[in-house]
Design a protein with these regions (language model features):
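Conserved N-terminal Rossmann-fold NAD(P) cofactor-binding segment
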Residues: 6-52
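Helix-loop-beta segment of a Rossmann-like dinucleotide-binding subdomain
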Residues: 75-78, 120-134, 185-195, 244-252
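Rossmann-like NAD(P)(H) cofactor-binding subdomain of soluble oxidoreductases
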Residues: 34-121
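Rossmann-fold dinucleotide-binding core
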Residues: 50, 86-169, 173
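Active-site-proximal catalytic alpha-helix in oxidoreductases
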Residues: 167-195, 199-212, 239
Length: 301
């Protein structure tokens, strides 16, 4: 598989970039189907890669501020910035670096792991779109960039859509992440096992109910019952059931800081501002925040 765009990957993870530069990116999907992706340029920073037409940010949300600073040398007056990341509020940070009519935002519905340099393991959705994104503010430049990205993703084998209004799709991903990311990290279970347990499923329902209330108040109507029906389908259909989501990897495997502040923490903040009680999200945010601040003090069996 080769790319059909002039694409530069910039990452300070030197071993990862070196491996991709030498051999391409080994991309494993569907439990073992392997593709060797080639044709990339690589760099450890954006300092010397020139001005880009489009800059895509796919970092952890707690790394976005630093990534924006690092990307400054490749951002010109007509560069379109794109966030394809988990969490709420990423587009607001991009708008501070470029005008709203030059910012796209969205997210994917596929889980990923990076087990070693140059290798990515992904769990795509069983069917349908893998990536959804839209413009913060429509303009000829933003719409042209969105249409081109849609074409490139689709031609590359990643079904995606550039939406007039991406918010329903973004909220769907955010609520799914608010549900399974922290619960998997706290309970040490995969999504399928959380939903098989009466207590785990009960926790999921409470988180979803609060998130849907907040989403509705923010102008994106969602009902918890309909969302839970779709969530159960995704867990039972092989999309997210059999891997540990990123927050579980952060907490259980790598002892890293998580994205809790832009997931459940953001739901809690929105809830307070809107007068909507969010006790489950409040408690989950406190638990994960406590865990990630005290890795060095935790019991080691």
């Amino acid at each position: 598989v080769t790319v059909t765009a002039d694409l530069t990957l910039a990452d300070p993870y030197k071993e990862h970039m070196d491996k991709i530069a030498a051999d391409g990116l080994t991309f494993v999907i569907n439990g073992g189907e392997t593709h060797q992706l080639t044709g990339f340029k690589t760099a450890y920073s954006a300092d010397d890669i020139g001005i880009m037409d489009i800059v895509i940010f796919m970092t952890k949300t707690n790394q976005l501020d630093e990534a924006l600073k690092g990307a400054a040398p490749c951002i010109g007056p007509e560069t379109v910035l794109v966030s394809l990341m988990n969490g709420l509020g990423n587009e607001d940070k991009l708008v501070k670096a470029a005008s709203p009519d030059r910012v796209l935002y969205g997210s994917g519905v596929l889980g990923t792991e990076l087990p070693e340099p140059g290798k990515c393991i992904s769990s795509p959705s069983a069917d349908g779109l893998q990536m959804n994104f839209g413009a913060v503010e429509h303009s000829p430049l933003a719409d042209a960039a969105g249409a081109e990205l849609e074409r490139l993703f689709n031609d590359g084998g990643c079904p995606c859509k550039f939406w007039d209004d991406v918010r329903p799709h973004l909220w769907q991903k955010i609520i799914t992440n608010c549900t399974f990311n922290p619960l998997s990290a706290i309970l040490r279970l995969k999504a399928k096992d959380i939903m098989k347990d009466m207590n785990g499923a009960g926790l999921a329902i409470q988180v979803v109910t609060e998130c849907c209330a907040v989403a509705t108040a923010k102008g994106c109507p969602m009902t918890a019952s309909a969302f839970m029906t779709e969530l159960r389908k995704s867990v039972g259909g092989g999309t997210i059931e059999d891997y540990y989501p990123s927050m579980a990897q952060d907490v259980l495997m790598f002892k890293r800081q998580t994205e809790i502040g832009t997931l459940n923490g953001a739901i809690s903040k929105y809830g307070k501002a809107l007068g909507i009680p969010t006790p489950a999200n409040d408690m989950i945010t406190k638990i994960i925040s406590c865990i990630q601040k005290n890795y060095d003090k935790q019991y080691q069996g």
